[in-house]
Amino acid sequence: MTKEDWEAVIGLEVHAQVSSNTKLFSSSSTEFGAEHNTQVSLVDAAMPGTLPILNYYCIEQAIRTGLALSAEINKYSYFDRKNYFYPDLPQGYQITQFFEPIVKNGRVFINDNEKEIRIARIHLEQDAGKSVHEESKTYVDLNRAGVALIEIVSEPDLRSSAEAAECMKKLRQILRYTGSCDGDMEKGSLRCDANVSVRLKGSNTFGTRCEIKNLNSIRHIVQAIDYEIQRQIEILESGEEISQDTLLFDVASGKTKVMRSKEDASDYRYFPEPDLLPVEVSQEKIDLIQSSLPELPDQKKLRYIEELGINEYDANVITSDKAIADYFEELIKKHDSKLAVTWLTVELFGRLNKANIDIVSSPIKANALSELLDFIVDGTISAKLGKQVFDIMFETGKPASLIIEEQDLKQITDKCQISEVIDKIINSNQDKVQEYKSGKTRLYGFFVGEVMKLTKGKASPDVVNSILSERLG
């Protein structure tokens, strides 16, 4: 058998940190980067006698996420205890939703909306703390303990690492659009576990799955899944059996390694959380959240293509990130969509990529670029000079109006002034005038270039072409 005879079966468990200022069951801050153990309440530290108080904002964000994924909202849900011991889990259990999650039966589309990935459930749970390793010692930081997580669990509908990466990107995109999570994988706001198994193509039986924990970048998702697929195929082809293990991905070696034997639900002894009441959500509340949802990426993309005439590639690029889409929306409030696309995707993106920064960190905000386009559209400066102004704006952060004034870049539109320049050039180059009239029409560019040279690029191209065509016959 060859690799082509096998089929991968993959499901994702995506952990998204809720964009909330406080934790799921306490008023402790969730700000990133604080000193160790400075954002820990008595509840987070599991001090005896303390009781959790539910942050209902997190419930609303879970519902927003569910609605954005066309899921069913459970009007009656409750929390459970997942019992296990780990040094950074002070309670000795995690408060999660096992039996009755807040959301179920959703879907997300990948591969240009050609493939549907079913979402089995979305539930809320609290994050654990973090173990900090220094030389021969390990410390526990509880700043993250109790932070609210939305866990999105897909059905095993993915068949390759590329599809898994695409699914993760799409979920991150939707989470950012809804505002439920910032999607920052570098800061740990978004990570996923991948359940991977393989089977012979055509088989309806699932193989033994292994779970790869805590994948925190798209690249690592692809690398880890690809390695695990190949590892399992090699084991099965050698006649051995797959052991149901929980794995970690070693970035340095590019390999998955056994962390522990995979647990079943019974190992965690789930039971309802006795310190929290069930969560009841009215239809009115669901409708209110539904009405507050923004235009989602697929809807926005369709509008850009059908109403604004933008090609599919550019529409994909612009809607790929909410920050980019917001920037574009600001530009098209005043300007033609195609002009906005060019300046955003070619001029701005080119400079951002060169500087290795994203649009959020751009030194040129949307209103500043819009002002520059105003000057180009009304003829104050030419598009060519506009690019020079744009460079200075990018380097200095100065507004276009100030740069145009300081550099004396206002376009010359006075016909008499431009006529004088053209007459001077024609009188000084009679030989080239005769050659042009004899059929060497390529010399037209020479005359335009001379005009621009004498006017330092400030002559209006439209006026120059109008007068020059008349003079040269």
Curated annotation (Swiss-Prot):
Gene3D superfamilies: 1.10.10.410, GatB domain, N-terminal subdomain
Keyword Ligase included in the entry's annotation: yes
Assigned protein family: Belongs to the GatB/GatE family. GatB subfamily.
Subunit structure as annotated in this protein's UniProt entry: Heterotrimer of A, B and C subunits.
PROSITE patterns linked: GATB
Cysteine disulfide partners in this protein: none
Reaction catalysed by this enzyme: L-glutamyl-tRNA(Gln) + L-glutamine + ATP + H2O = L-glutaminyl-tRNA(Gln) + L-glutamate + ADP + phosphate + H(+); L-aspartyl-tRNA(Asn) + L-glutamine + ATP + H2O = L-asparaginyl-tRNA(Asn) + L-glutamate + ADP + phosphate + 2 H(+)
UniProt keyword terms in alphabetical order: ATP-binding, Ligase, Nucleotide-binding, Protein biosynthesis
InterPro entries, per the entry: Asn/Gln-tRNA_amidoTrfase_suB/E, Asn/Gln-tRNA_Trfase_suB/E_cat, Asn/Gln_amidotransferase, Asn/Gln_tRNA_amidoTrase-B-like, GatB, GatB_C_1, GatB_Yqey_C_2, Gln-tRNA_amidoTrfase_suB_CS
Primary role: Allows the formation of correctly charged Asn-tRNA(Asn) or Gln-tRNA(Gln) through the transamidation of misacylated Asp-tRNA(Asn) or Glu-tRNA(Gln) in organisms which lack either or both of asparaginyl-tRNA or glutaminyl-tRNA synthetases. The reaction takes place in the presence of glutamine and ATP through an activated phospho-Asp-tRNA(Asn) or phospho-Glu-tRNA(Gln).
Entry EC number(s): 6.3.5.-
Protein name: Aspartyl/glutamyl-tRNA(Asn/Gln) amidotransferase subunit B
Keyword Disulfide bond: no
Pfam family, one: GatB_N
Species this chain originates from: Wolbachia sp. subsp. Drosophila simulans (strain wRi)
Gene Ontology biological process terms from the UniProt entry: glutaminyl-tRNAGln biosynthesis via transamidation; translation
